[in-house]
Amino acid sequence: MTKKKSEEDFEETEELVVEVADTEDLTIDDLPGVGPATAEKLREAGFDDLMAIGVMTPADLADQAELGEAVSARIINGARKMASIGGFLSGMDILEKRREVLKLTSGCQSIDELLGGGFETKSITELYGEFGSGKTQFSHQLAVNAMLPLKEGGLSDEDDPAHVFFIDTEDTFRPERIRQMAAAKGLNPDVVLERCHVARAYNSAHQMLLVDEVKKAASGINVKMIVVDSVISHFRAEFVGRGMLANRQQKLNRHLKELKQLSDVNNAVVLICNQVMSKPDAMWGDPTKAVGGHIISHASAFRIYLRKAKAGRRIARLVDSPNLPEGEAVFSVIEDGLTD
């Protein structure tokens, strides 16, 4: 059976022109030519608002919603026009949109100052460092902090509490640690754990599939943070050798692109933990280098290098940012969590 019959509720239109006073009140049912059957397919695939559709490519939407590519292209164009996605905006318009960005506190004043107030939503932040440098501790702490009210540096609204999703590739999520950190913040540990959604990824394909599962879940709950720990582990193990490098990087690029879309659509923080390698030919300086190449470095708006220091302390160095200078902050990991 072809898809043509299942899409007959989509009406052909030469041009999709929509004049609206407030796009926030529009739904996918308002898209020109989208009937009940197509709308149901879109919702089942996790596309329940114009932004989620507008940031997709025709091929991806066709694959995920089981629609024809031509139909998907028309739906995407309609969503982009209705939600004003993809056109040129003035610098003032961009500045106004930036006001939607939230800052998630790390719980350490020095780190928050380093990051201009905290970890940004609508961005991918990369943490990289050797084992024991604090990457997993950071991810647990930020997950707990996301449950704090907005006025306390969290991402949780009283009427719409925040939820955090962990894509765990190395079996490092520890609910016991979440309980410790939540209690230290004065939060109910059981409630915090209920709002942490954890899935173990067993290979790179499963890891990418879990992003689609987060997308579907976001239609019913307030997803404010996605953690991938670690982002490169499976790709590094499965795509071995120079001959498979191009294929690995293509898949990794798509994975990061989908995470960025989730971040934009849900105004959420995306935190990816990355592994490192040592450059044997380094003659001077720190030989430690993040794995993943330019794909990860370009996808990450903020790159933070974690390393061990003396007396059990650790150093977070902001290596790259679109608007902040390089700098360092010193922190410690104690029973209650991260502290200055």
Predicted feature descriptions by range:
Residues Q249-N253, K257-D340:
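Phosphate-binding/switch region of NTP-binding enzymes
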Residues I28-L31, L42-Q64:
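A short amphipathic alpha-helix within small helical-bundle interaction modules
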Residues D159-M244:
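Conserved inter-motif catalytic segment of the P-loop NTP-binding fold
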